[in-house]
């Protein structure tokens, strides 16, 4: 097919204080094998380290076919506003995001482009990701890329409420028009992926590649998301610090979920026309209420009595252990 007829893709790679890891991320987007129109936007959100210098250096050395745009904010905007700003710099029809510590497979653009051509009603397509974990004290390297799939992947339409499925920005390609529609509504500084993908869901169908991963998703040893990291339980002081960070993270997640629920309510009152039916919006609100209730439970867990924790405990030994007082629970995790 004529390359000019292939979907046009803007790859947005954002970074903030990621000098130590962003080379791999940039190398992976520079190494795409897609022959359609591509522009790559490297955007630094006011880093205090050499993140932007790495972006400049690698752009100057790049000799590939894609147009590269550099952007730097003097003052950090935060993840959500930064991504929204970078999308505003894009000129192509589809937006493919990547964080500065992740790694795209070379065929990522090509597979997404195939999916959106096969399903022209899609406003977004979501792939799977392969999680990779740092180990404290060990130099990190991404694994070798898997073998290139010989056949195009299976594609399924996501069914049910939006919040019944997981959506991660680095795993999605979204129409720019869906991002632009969402600009009319507030965006949270954290867990922005939920809201941006939700805006896409409101505008049309989301398709999934259920068996196909297209990127490596990196969990840093000190990252709050690295719940299984040995670093997290290196000592009691560190374990307790992570517990406090968890509470901050949960509050940020709750803010994002509540923003989506508020928008559902406003749409039901006629704020703006959307693709989704009244029944779908009501189902989405119910899913978000359940999420908020669960977040409240996690936030208040250590304030519950033993009997309350026991009645709410999860499955297996881990669920039983979590009924212990907090310090005993953390000590148990350190020893296991």
Tell what function each PLM region has.
Residues 18-31:
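Short, well-formed alpha-helical segments that are part of the catalytic scaffolds
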Residues 107-141:
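Conserved donor NDP-sugar-binding/catalytic core segment of glycosyltransferases
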Residues 150-237:
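Conserved nucleotide-sugar donor-binding catalytic segment
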Residues 7-10, 28, 39, 195:
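Cell-envelope/extracellular polymer assembly enzymes that use nucleotide-activated donors
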Residues 95:
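Short aromatic/hydrophobic "clamp" motif used to bind/position activated sugar donors
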Residues 44-53, 75, 99:
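A conserved acidic beta->alpha catalytic loop
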Residues 73-90:
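Glycine-rich, basic loop-to-helix element that forms the pyrophosphate-binding segment
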Residues 23, 49-58, 103, 107:
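Acidic helix N-cap motif at the loop->helix transition within catalytic regions
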């Amino acid at each position: 097919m004529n390359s000019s007829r292939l979907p046009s893709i803007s790859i947005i790679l954002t970074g903030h204080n990621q000098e130590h890891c962003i080379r791999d991320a940039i190398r992976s987007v520079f190494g795409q094998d897609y022959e359609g129109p591509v522009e790559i936007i490297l955007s630094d959100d006011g880093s205090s380290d050499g993140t932007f210098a790495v972006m400049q250096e690698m752009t100057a050395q790049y000799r590939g076919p894609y147009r590269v745009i550099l952007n730097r904010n003097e003052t950090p905007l935060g993840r959500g506003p930064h991504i929204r700003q970078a999308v505003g710099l894009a000129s192509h029809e589809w937006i493919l995001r990547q964080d500065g510590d992740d790694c795209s497979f070379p065929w990522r653009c090509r597979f997404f482009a195939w999916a959106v051509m096969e399903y022209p009603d899609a406003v977004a397509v979501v792939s799977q990701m392969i999680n990779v974990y740092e180990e404290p004290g060990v130099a990190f390297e991404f694994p070798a890329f898997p073998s290139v799939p010989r056949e195009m992947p299976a594609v399924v339409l996501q069914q049910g409420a939006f919040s019944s499925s997981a959506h991660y920005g680095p795993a999605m390609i979204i129409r720019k028009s869906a991002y632009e529609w969402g600009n009319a509504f507030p965006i949270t500084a954290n867990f922005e992926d939920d809201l941006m993908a939700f805006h896409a869901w409101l505008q049309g169908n989301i398709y999934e590649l259920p068996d196909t991963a297209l990127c490596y998703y990196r969990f840093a040893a000190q990252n709050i998301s690295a719940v299984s990291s040995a670093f997290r339980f290196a000592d009691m002081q560190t374990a307790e610090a992570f517990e406090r960070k968890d509470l901050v993270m949960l509050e940020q997640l709750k803010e994002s979920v509540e923003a989506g629920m508020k928008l559902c309510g406003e749409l039901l009152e006629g704020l703006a026309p959307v693709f989704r039916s009244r029944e779908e919006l009501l189902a989405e609100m119910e899913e978000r209420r359940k999420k908020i209730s669960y977040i409240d439970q996690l936030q208040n867990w250590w304030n519950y009595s033993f009997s309350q924790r026991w009645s709410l405990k999860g499955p297996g030994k881990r669920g039983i252990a979590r009924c212990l007082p907090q310090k005993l629970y953390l000590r148990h995790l350190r020893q296991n």
